[in-house]
């Protein structure tokens, strides 16, 4: 599971909520070299890797790093360049990706504004690679841009503010389960919040709340 976080100047106040979102997500995973792998990247004008998919193999290590993450800063926001960075540097075998082994690749993108570059080409490339992308944006983001980035338009979601991220997590979990079942050649498996759906991939289950949320398709 890869997280791409908008670390531009405009998200400074919302960064703690993004960090908490990642932390809660990681807490639900079965982290290990042969199970779930996690990477976190921040971006603004350029990208900065917090850690790669093969940097840490225990949940405690990852949580320690996530809790200590600091806001990157920078402008303008270039989401297209951030996505391209993932293609070139994160979804690769040398960085720990098992895409070529058939392990589903999940990407969650948190965006706080409109991109100053074009997202079309890298977004299409990620889809061709089979990366299952979910884009979540605040009211300052572009709804059409979120839909382009997401694997399907229905995987794009808008919240009023990053503090409302808990409100999308139940729906996100449900959508991820559906997508993973579609790409996983296993039959007759009863899904539960802790059932491994494929090697190295577990469903995401986080606590929902009642804040406003708008699914874009």
Segments predicted by a language model, with ranges:
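Eukaryotic intrinsically disordered and solvent-exposed regulatory patches
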Residues: 11-13, 24-28, 91-96, 118-123, ...
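Von Willebrand factor A/integrin I-like adhesion domains
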Residues: 63-69, 123-134, 139-180
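Von Willebrand factor
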Residues: 1-108, 114-121, 135-144, 167
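Fold-core signature of tandem repeat domains
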Residues: 1, 26, 62, 66, ...
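Extracellular/luminal ectodomains of metazoan preproproteins built from arrays
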Residues: 1, 77-79, 100-101, 151, ...
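DG-centered beta-turn motif at the end of beta-strands
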Residues: 4-7, 18, 40-43, 86, ...
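Sec-exported extracytoplasmic/periplasmic mature domains
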Residues: 23-31, 58, 67, 71-74, ...
């Amino acid at each position: 599971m890869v997280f791409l976080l908008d670390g531009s100047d405009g998200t400074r106040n919302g960064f703690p909520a993004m960090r908490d979102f990642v932390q809660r997500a990681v807490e639900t995973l079965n982290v290990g070299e042969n199970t779930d792998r996690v990477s976190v990247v921040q971006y603004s004008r350029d990208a900065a890797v917090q850690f790669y998919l093969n940097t840490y193999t225990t949940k405690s290590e990852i949580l320690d790093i996530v809790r200590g993450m600091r806001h990157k800063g920078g402008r303008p926001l270039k989401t297209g360049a951030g996505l391209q960075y993932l293609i070139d540097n994160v979804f690769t075998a040398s960085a720990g990706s098992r895409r070529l082994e058939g392990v589903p690749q999940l990407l969650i993108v948190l965006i706080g504004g409109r991109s100053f570059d074009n997202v079309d080409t890298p977004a299409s490339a990620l889809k061709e690679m089979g990366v299952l992308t979910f884009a979540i944006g605040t009211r300052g983001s572009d709804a059409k841009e979120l839909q382009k980035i997401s694997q399907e338009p229905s995987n794009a979601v808008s919240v009023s503010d990053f503090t409302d991220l808990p409100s999308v997590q139940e729906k996100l979990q449900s959508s991820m389960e559906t997508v993973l079942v579609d790409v996983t050649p296993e039959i007759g498996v009863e899904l539960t919040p802790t059932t491994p759906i494929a090697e190295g991939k577990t469903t995401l289950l986080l606590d929902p709340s009642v804040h406003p949320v708008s699914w874009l398709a």
